[in-house]
Amino acid sequence: MTEQFRYTDERFADIQMLRYRLDGFEALTLRQKLYIYYLAKATLCGRDITTDQFGRYNLRIRKVLEAIYERYEGDRTTVEYKALETYLKRVWFSNGIHHHYGCEKFVPAFTEEYFRQVVDCCGCEDENIDELCKVIFDPTIQPKRVNQKAGDDLVQTSACNYYEGVTQQEAEDFYEAMRDENDPMPISYGLNTTLRKTADGMLKEDVWHEGGLYGDAIKHIIYWLEKAAEVAENELQAKIIGMLVDYYRTGDLRKFDAYSIEWLKEHEGRIDFINGFIEVYGDPLGMKASWEGIVTYKDMVATQRTQTISKNAQWFEDHSPVDPRFRKPQVVGVTANVVCSAMLGGDEYPSTAIGINLPNADWIRARYGSKSITIGNLTHAYNQAAKGNGFLQEFVADEATRALIEKYGDVCDDLHTDLHECLGHGSGQLLAGVSADALGSYGSTIEEARADLFGLYYIADAKLVELGLVPDAEAYKSQYYTYMMNGLLTQLTRIQPGNEIEEAHMRNRALIARWTLEHYPSAVRLVKHEEKTYVEVSDYEQLREAFAKLLAEIQRIKSEGDFEAAKQLVERYAIHVEPKLHEELLARYKSLGIAPVSYTHLTLPTS
């Protein structure tokens, strides 16, 4: 059965759909399956919240397109109809009209005239099609979902729907006035609100809760959460759900923090979930969270790997190559599991994370710890789908390095994710008086770089061989090579010609790889073979020295809240794309006949 399972599915635009398995699901008890079912239903209810957060016109546009898709009785074989169908699929995939990675607005391959024609044929109900046409077809209207270009007003030039009639300076001043530097347990200001300017010029927050904005969707989420609580695996799970429901009803962020602390304590059950306003990557100011949901159950065998890491978290913290002032003196509450994803929703679907570490509040991490997951059935699907596609042959110049990657690549990829989530995000501390938001729009990139560097530094450590996490002292080299290759070259195939790097994880990888290339030319360089560019690593030990040095600086920036240093690193290394190199990489990728690595996953509960 496993050999016959097909991991790849439909492909459109730059998207390759993936399928994944739910191994072990059938072995769960009926009560556990019911628990997953109810949590999954709650996960599906927040979809429209995310779509609306990503742009104020998204829901209206999606509904018109869906009406056409369902009702159109004309010729569905024409080039323009097929283009409209692809556009709709892209809207479904990205939860809106902007690319999920690059944040640029989609360019429709059908005309406005054709769109109006099919709208008329279908009798689509929207009071202002003219307005929607301007948004869809005018490239100057809402060109970017999240704009991070230095010097621009990031709020007014971003299409995301977190602010209304507000400038960047007004938003920053509004939240700065709220902060209390003497509060040891600060809430995540603005996390669950839309900030808008009223008719009289005052700034007002619309809170996302049952009785407020997004209330209809939240009521449905609450309904299914309460059903789930009735069949929870233990009393603490039921209590945690009750606390989450209380937060959803009130929108009180103190209640969200209390819920997060209790959620950290629950690790006896096999099933876990995330449901709420969590990550702030979609806000150019890094404060407001998109809605997301995921339901998981533990992979009991693979979890032994992550538990080994978490049990040794204090050793890793104590031996980190950062200034001792920035280390945690006592690591508490670090738990890590390998899980199977049973359902994804909101900002976790269709393009999803493969690892998660929560909660995000630094003071909760310091006092109570964090939970990390590596989503094993998703990483397995990625790995299986990539086999035999010619990628390594095209981008790795020598056979010895290809053999190294083929031997160790899957193991080291999973392990780096474990280290990134479990130890990287959970490591270090802010100095007293430093705000978690001190790095502003650069914060997400710096945080992801910090976690990646922690993983890169330790994946080469003899401690991992001692713990049995890697088979030998050579394994880490596969991760070092593929990381540098991705950061310098192959991740650029996800970007459209003329665009820059926008997404925080991509910026982080570019920052690390380009900084290392510049500062350690005797360890790594770009070389040409037959007019093709490759990465050549000549000294892997020096690479580790580079990662250690950069980790120390990145941690200093985070701990001290050094905005200017963060800005200089990100602006210099993380954003810009060299056009000729980009053109070459896109052509080479196209020759393979595979889509850039922008995948989705279709849940198939198959054992």
What label would you give each PLM region?
Residues T29, S444-A460:
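An active-site-proximal "capping" alpha-helix that borders the catalytic cofactor pocket
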Residues E3-K63:
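N-terminal-proximal low-complexity accessory segments that begin disordered
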